[in-house]
Regions:
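Short, hydrophobic/aromatic-enriched beta-strand segments in well-ordered soluble domains
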Residues: 71-75, 125-135, 216-221
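Alpha-helix-centered segments that form part of catalytic cores
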Residues: 179-209
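Aromatic- and charge-enriched surface segment that lines or borders ligand/interaction sites
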Residues: 56-104, 128
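Ligand-site clamp/hinge motif
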Residues: 191-195, 222-235
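Short, solvent-exposed loop/turn elements at domain surfaces
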Residues: 14-22, 47-50, 80-81, 137-140, ...
């Protein structure tokens, strides 16, 4: 063990590292937070929500039983290839949670009050969640881990249908061969374990994943969060 290494003994293997399809607690609580990020997360001292990918907690508007939550992404936030994290990545991530052919049963109930996401052509860092009013809506929507569309859907297959169609479980989607091909790949063990495919905006990248032996992550050089490292505990 070198001075810049930390070795942690786990009682069991992580089942995978796909934030949508992997449900085991070890992966979700101890490994994935190093690789993936969300709009918001919890301050471990106060247990209040604090911004991570978002610039701030959302502005919330209520209209009867409908709520709208406005978020804006941090301008510093980028993926490993240097491209900015945008509204397209947010919408894509939520489409994977609602796509009927994706193994997403562990996540879908936590956001089943969502009706749609509004995007803004003049500002690709701004989004508005439109949902049924729900007491846990800010943390439910804000803490879902965001995926890079360019890695997980390079052909932009899920863009064929709007998010509202995925939420409504539109029959056209269920019968679409391209969506089925996407889902089969997204559900695969390779996408949950291959270091070239397990990609997020967090401070660490997956180096190797050997069942029964070790899982190695490495801190990224020139990580985007280093630019705002005094913002909060997540940087």
């Amino acid at each position: 063990v070198y001075k810049d290494q930390v070795v942690i003994h786990g009682l069991s293997d992580a089942k995978g590292l796909n934030p949508v399809t992997t449900s085991d607690a070890y992966a979700n609580e101890y490994i994935m937070p190093n690789i993936f990020q969300s709009l918001l997360s919890y301050d471990h001292q106060t247990m209040g929500l604090i911004p991570v990918l978002a610039k701030a907690r959302p502005t919330v508007r209520l209209n009867g039983d409908v709520a709208e939550l406005d978020f804006e992404l941090r301008p510093e936030a980028t993926w490993d290839n240097g491209t900015p994290i945008t509204a397209d990545d947010i919408v894509f991530s939520f489409k994977t949670v609602f796509c009927s052919m994706v193994n997403n049963d562990n996540l879908k109930p936590s956001v089943d009050y969502l009706k749609d996401i509004k995007t803004y052509p003049d500002n690709n860092r701004k989004i508005t969640f439109i949902c049924n009013k729900y007491i846990g809506m800010e943390d439910g929507l804000g803490t879902l881990r965001i995926l890079p569309e360019y890695v997980y859907d390079p052909q932009k297959v899920l863009r064929k249908y709007p998010l509202s169609n995925y939420i409504a479980a539109n029959h056209s989607i269920a019968n679409d061969a391209a969506i089925k091909t996407f889902a089969d790949n997204f559900n695969s063990e390779k996408v949950a374990r291959d270091s070239s495919l397990v990609k997020g905006s967090g401070a660490y990248r997956l180096i190797s994943f050997e069942t029964g032996q070790r899982l190695i992550v490495e801190r990224k050089a020139n990580w985007w969060g280093d630019k705002i490292n005094k913002e909060n505990e997540y940087f």
